[in-house]
Amino acid sequence: MSLLFVFNRIGFILYTGYYKHALKNPIFDEIIKTLFNGARYDNRVVSSLAILFIIIGLLGLFAPKHQIKMLNITAYFSIAIILFLNIANIVYYGIYGNVFDENLLEFLHEDTLTILKMSTEYPIFSSFSLFVILSVLISFIYFKLQNALFKPNVYQTTKPLKTFILFALFSLTQMFYINAQLSFVGASLDLSIEPAKDPFLMKITPGAFRNLYLLVRNYRQSHNLKFSDFAKETPLEVAKNYFNLKENPQNNLYELLTQTSRNNSNQTIQHVFYIVSESLSSWHFDPKFDAIGLTSALQDLAKKEHAHMLSAFIESAPRTVKSLDVQITGLPYINDNNLVNSGVILPSFPMAIGNITKTLGYKNNFYYGGSGIWNKLTSFTKKQGFHALYFNNHLLEFAKNKPYPKPIESNWGVHDNILFDYILENTNPNEKTFSMVMTLSNHAIKNVNLKAFGVPLEKIQQFVEKTPKSENLPDANSLGHIYWYDKVIVSFIKKASQKFPNSLFIITGDHFDRSYEYAKNDLYTIKSVPLILYSPTLKPKKISQVGSHLDIAPTIIELIAPEGFPFVSFGKPLFSNNTTNPPSHPNYALGYEAIATKDYFYNPSLGLRYLNESPKEPEDKQNDKKQNDKKQNDKKQNDKIEASKFYQQLESLKALSYYLLYHGANLKD
C-alpha cells in the first residue's frame, strides 16, 4: 500500500508537474524530499488500513468460509479508495490549481449539467476510466502476489517465536507509521517537516487523505455556528448598535468600515517592518526584571525621540495561528478555528494589511522561520495580498556555511537571528517593501545556544533562585531566551535603520507568554502584549493610550498613505503624522475575551483589573475616609457599567466578523 501511494505521487508530479508545467523548479533533490515527506503522511493512512484489515480478519474467524472473501474485499476497497482520491486530487488540481480545499464544497453542490460541461474541458470521465482500469489491474496483481507469497500451510502449525517476531515487527512498523518516527509520541508533520520550496511540490506533500480530512473536519466544526450564537439581535440591528447609527444601515459592512488617511506629512516611508514576536508579552517589561536587563534593549528603543510604546495594548487572539489570522486579514477573532480551516472559501479581504499596502505600491513579503506548509501559509498569505513567502528552506540555505552558533533551528523552525539577517539581505533598497515577520525562537522547545551569544545565564539563574518560589517565575532558560530575543531584534532594527533610513518598525507580540504560570491569575498580564512603534524619520502624534492588534494595520496606513487615501478596517489608527487634525480613536480596545481602556482591563468572569492599584480619583482632604471610600466604590460601579457596555461591543464585533466570513458584506436580516 505504501508503494501505491508513492507511485500515485510520482504520477502527480509527472502529469501535473511536468506535463502540465505546474512544477516551476524541477530539482531532483526537491522531488525526492517531497516523496519522502509525503510518504510520512501517507503511512498513517496505510497504518489505519492495516488495522482495518486485521479487524476484518478477526471478524472472519466467526465465518471461516467467508474469511478470505472478506479480506479480499477489504484489500480491493483499500486499493480503490487510494486510487480514487489520489486521481481525483490530480484532476482537482487541474481545475482549481490547488489540492482539495474549500472549493471542493462548491464542486459537490454543482448541478449535474454543470459537471457534465466541466467534463468536456477537464479530464473527468477519462480520469474515472483510468481509475477503473488501474483498480482492476492493481487488484489483479495484488491477488496474484498474495497467492504466490502466502500459500496455504498444509501442516497447520505455527511456531510461537516466529509469531512473536512477526507481531513485534508489525507493532514497530505501526508505531513508526502512525507516529511518523520511532517513538511512542506522534510527530506533528505540519510543523516538523521541511517542505520543498516549489509551491506545487509543497502543496502535494500532505496528500489527498490529509487534505480531505482537514476539509471535512473543518466543515463540520464551522457549520455548527449560527449568528444567534453571537448575538440575539438581527445582523442589521447589531450593525446599527455597533456603529452607533440612528437606524438600520442600508449600505454593506465594508462601506461602514471605510475610513481615510489624514497623513499630511511629506516624508515617504520606503520600508515597513511589521514584526510579530512569538510570546512577547507586557510582563517581560515589568520593572522586577530590570535587575537582569530582560528587555533593556527594547526599553531603550522605546525611549528614543522617534519611538513610542503604548501603555495598554490587548491581544486579539490566544495563540499564534489565530493572532496571525487577525493581523493578516484584519478580520476580528470569531472562535478558535483557524481561518484556513473554517470550511468556507476565504475571500481576499479588503481590510487585509497586504491588500492595502499592495494598493499603495509596496512589494509585500512575509517571513517565517518555520514550514511554509504550516497553516497553509503560502496560499493564505498570497490570498491576502503578499507577493512572496520566505520560510525555513530559504533560511537554511542562507545559513549554509555561515558560522552561526549551533543549533540553528528548533523543532519549530530556524532561529530568529538568522531570520533577521536574511531579511536585511533580502530587502531591496530600491523598491518600496512591506515586510511582515513572524518569529519563533521563544516557542518551546527553546534551544538557542544562549552561552554562545553571551546571555548571562548564571546571573539570570541567581535572580530566579532569589525570587520567592510563590511567584513561580519561568526558569532561567525561558528568561534567557526572552533576554536573547530582546537584544537580537533591537540589533536588527539598528542595522535596518542604517541601511534603510526611511523605514517604519512595528513590534508586537502574538499572544501572552504562557511560561509565566503565576501570572495566569492576573487579567492584565494574560491579555496584554506590547506595541512599540519606531521610525527614524517620523515624529507621529499618539492618538490613543490603548489599542489592540486590530489597530495596527490602520496605524500603518495612517502613517504611510497619502492624505485622503481610503481604506477598510475594523480598527482605528493609534498614531498620526497630522498633529493638528488627527483621526479619532474611541479610547477603548476590543481584544480576545476582554476589553481594555487606559485605566483598566475587563472580563465578565474576572471583573475589572485596574492598571494602577485603584481607580484614579483626586483625594479631598476635607472629606473623611468613609466619603472617599464611597467615591471609590461609586467610581468602580460606574467603570463596571462602562466596561460591560464595551464588552457588549466586543460581542457585536464577533457577530459581525462571523457574518462577514460566512455571509459576506451585504447586511440582511
For each predicted feature, which ranges?
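Short alpha-helical "patches" and their helix-cap loops
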Residues: 69, 224-234, 340-345, 570-572
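Transmembrane and membrane-interface helices of multi-pass
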Residues: 1-225
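A general boundary/transition motif marking the beginning of the first structured unit of a protein
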Residues: 27, 103, 196-204, 227, ...
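Membrane/wall-proximal cationic-aromatic binding patches
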Residues: 121, 125, 192-199, 205-275, ...
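Solvent-exposed soluble domains appended to multi-pass membrane proteins
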Residues: 244-625, 634-669
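Residues that form generic nucleotide/phosphate-binding pockets
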Residues: 38, 42, 118, 144, ...
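Alpha-helix initiation and N-capping motif
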Residues: 4, 101, 112, 206-209, ...
